[in-house]
Amino acid sequence: MRAVFPGRFQPFHLGHLAVIEWLLSKYDELIIVVGSGKDSHTIYNPFTAGERILMIKKGLKEFNVDFTRVIFFPIMDSFTSGLWIRNLELYSPKFDVVVSGNPLVISDAREAGYIVDLPPMFNREMYNATKIRKLMLENNESWSELVPKSVYSFIKEIKGDERLRDIARNDY
């Protein structure tokens, strides 16, 4: 069976990693859908889709996760309920299961006739991308403990944390 795991991954963190490891132990293949594919350089979406795919690949490689069974697929947001899943059906390989804890994603997937699998929440209070971006905005380096080391290094290399602070200064 092939599962779809949608997320924004802004940034990719250890909670995402735990879900992906769990999914790969359960399914033959995994499509990681990188949402908000055209959005970047904002407070909520500071990283490009390409940067996020690289983060995920680096994190999986660091933890020796075999990602030969993983397909990466960026998708643009759709503000019409259910349209994102129809777009995914048009452009991605066929899939059987949608994996999410997001109520809107769950509703859209069920309405489209898909099996929905709820992933375990791996310490969601700690591993939360909004919290990580907030720590970056505060120039609090403790966010480094919430992401794979390779992701931390990559974000530092592209100055992603500085970018986020620059965006915040220019938005107000």
From Swiss-Prot:
GO molecular function (one): nicotinamide-nucleotide adenylyltransferase activity
Superkingdom classification of source: Archaea
Subcellular location: Cytoplasm
GO BP, one annotated term: NAD biosynthetic process
EC number assigned by the record: 2.7.7.1
Taxonomic lineage of the native organism: Archaea, Thermoproteota, Thermoprotei, Sulfolobales, Sulfolobaceae
Organism of origin: Sulfurisphaera tokodaii (strain DSM 16993 / JCM 10545 / NBRC 100140 / 7) (Sulfolobus tokodaii)
One GO cellular component term: cytoplasm
Class of this enzyme: transferase
Protein's UniProt name: Nicotinamide-nucleotide adenylyltransferase
InterPro entries: Cyt_trans-like (IPR004821), NMN_Atrans_arc (IPR006418), Rossmann-like_a/b/a_fold (IPR014729)
Protein family (similarity comment): Belongs to the archaeal NMN adenylyltransferase family.
Record keywords: ATP-binding, Cytoplasm, NAD, Nucleotide-binding, Nucleotidyltransferase, Pyridine nucleotide biosynthesis, Transferase
Catalyses which reaction(s): beta-nicotinamide D-ribonucleotide + ATP + H(+) = diphosphate + NAD(+)
Associated pathway: Cofactor biosynthesis; NAD(+) biosynthesis; NAD(+) from nicotinamide D-ribonucleotide: step 1/1
